[in-house]
UniProtKB/Swiss-Prot annotation:
NAD(+) binds at D146, D229, G254. The keyword Oxidoreductase applies. CDD domains: ErythrP_dh. This is Erythronate-4-phosphate dehydrogenase. Pfam families: 2-Hacid_dh, 2-Hacid_dh_C, DUF3410. It is found in: Cytoplasm. Homodimer. It catalyses: 4-phospho-D-erythronate + NAD(+) = (R)-3-hydroxy-2-oxo-4-phosphooxybutanoate + NADH + H(+). It comes from Acinetobacter baumannii (strain ACICU). One of its GO terms (biological process) is pyridoxine biosynthetic process. Pathway: Cofactor biosynthesis; pyridoxine 5'-phosphate biosynthesis; pyridoxine 5'-phosphate from D-erythrose 4-phosphate: step 2/5. The active site is at R206, E234, H251.
Length: 355
């Protein structure tokens, strides 16, 4: 069997080499010719899997080792009779830890604020519910908005109420452009007007959920602290926007070693189900041991002392800013940051909590 795989997927050889010949390709520039005689295609979110890519091919299976599906033309896949799978929730823990790291980097005193600090979570799916759990471990008050999901463990409120009450807002919705609850430009001029000026905003979901022009106007007006891991015009990012952000990272919020490995394992399991193979591999057997920071210690004390050793978000911020050339970060530089990213470990690898 011929398998075409994104060159940046983790542990592809471990999971798939026994099944056939793996050909590695750059995901963003994948062509119909690349996949024409392949039976399986393994991708990330940078590959648009659409009708022009998949029609008149030998493809029987497409697996995306990512949580989202907005890059997959599901209708076209099903029309062609191609089985597809994604990896919903694979990196949810990593994203939740990213958000908490960003908040504590901006204000370490949040560790002492308990319920004086209110975190508003927009989207209560795989990431949102884990973030709620982790935030409550720190004693924070958590409110959430999701038109489809309610969590018993938090106060569920309207979007407008969340914008007005939260000290920080973290976005965890898929990108959708149709329907009553479309998320495209969910954060527009109206939403920013409802936010308190000192409310922190974090987007680690999908770039176009936040309308960039409205965001720039808002920061100019309020001096708001904003953290972006995703961008509306990604992979190109303007220097003007970067200079306004409190923290910027190159779409790596979910880039933990565990998250990457878990994503590949999930599409491996779907692959095995499709082709009738036994599922007999686990990513945990491939991970190196880590130094234990948390066991037997107070969670807040460890985060106060070891946060930058667990994940140095300031270095990621510095790296993306160093890529600015002629007023912007170009696609090539952005993609290289992601390709060469030193995958961090989740807190649990250091003996810490996990949602």
């Amino acid at each position: 069997m011929k398998i075409v795989a994104d060159e940046n997927l983790a542990f592809t050889d471990y999971f798939f080499s026994e099944f056939g010949d793996i050909q590695y390709k750059a995901g963003r520039t994948l062509t119909h010719t690349d996949v024409q005689d392949a039976e399986a295609l393994l991708v990330r979110s940078v590959t648009a899997v659409n009708e022009s890519l998949i029609q008149n091919t030998a493809l029987k299976y497409v697996g995306s080792a990512t949580i989202g599906t907005d890059h997959l033309d599901i209708q076209a896949l099903e029309k062609q009779g191609i089985t597809w799978a994604n990896a919903a929730g694979c990196n949810a823990q990593a994203v939740a830890e990213y958000v908490i790291t960003a908040l504590l980097h901006l204000d370490a005193s949040l560790l002492e604020q308990q319920e004086k600090f209110t975190l508003g979570i927009v989207g209560l799916g795989n990431v949102g519910k884990r973030l709620a759990y982790m935030a409550q471990l720190l004693g924070w008050k958590v409110i959430g908005f999701d038109p489809y999901v309610q969590l018993d463990s938090i106060e569920n409120v309207s979007f407008q109420t969340l914008l007005q009450q939260a000290n920080a807002v973290s976005i965890h919705v898929p990108l959708t452009k149709k329907g009553e609850h479309a998320t495209y430009h969910l954060f527009d001029e109206k939403a920013f007007a409802a936010l308190q000026p000192n409310t922190i905003l974090i987007n680690s979901a999908r770039g176009p959920v936040v309308k960039e022009a409205a965001l720039i106007e808002d920061i100019q007006r309020t001096q708001r602290k904003v953290v972006l891991d995703v961008f509306e015009h990604e992979p190109v990012i303007s220097e003007e926007l970067l200079n306004m952000l409190a923290l910027a990272t190159p779409h790596i919020a979910g880039y933990s070693l565990e998250g990457k490995a878990r994503g590949t394992q999930m599409i491996y399991e779907a692959f095995c189900q499709k082709f009738g193979y036994d599922i007999n591999k686990r990513f945990e057997t491939q991970l190196p041991a880590c130094e234990d920071y948390f066991s037997g210690h107070d969670l807040k004390a460890v985060l106060k002392q070891k946060l930058s050793q667990i994940y140095d978000i300031a270095q990621d911020d510095a790296n993306i800013r160093a890529c600015v050339k002629e007023g912007k970060v170009e696609q090539k530089a952005f993609d290289l940051l992601r390709k060469n990213y030193p995958l961090r470990r989740e807190w649990a690898a250091h003996g810490g909590p996990q949602a």
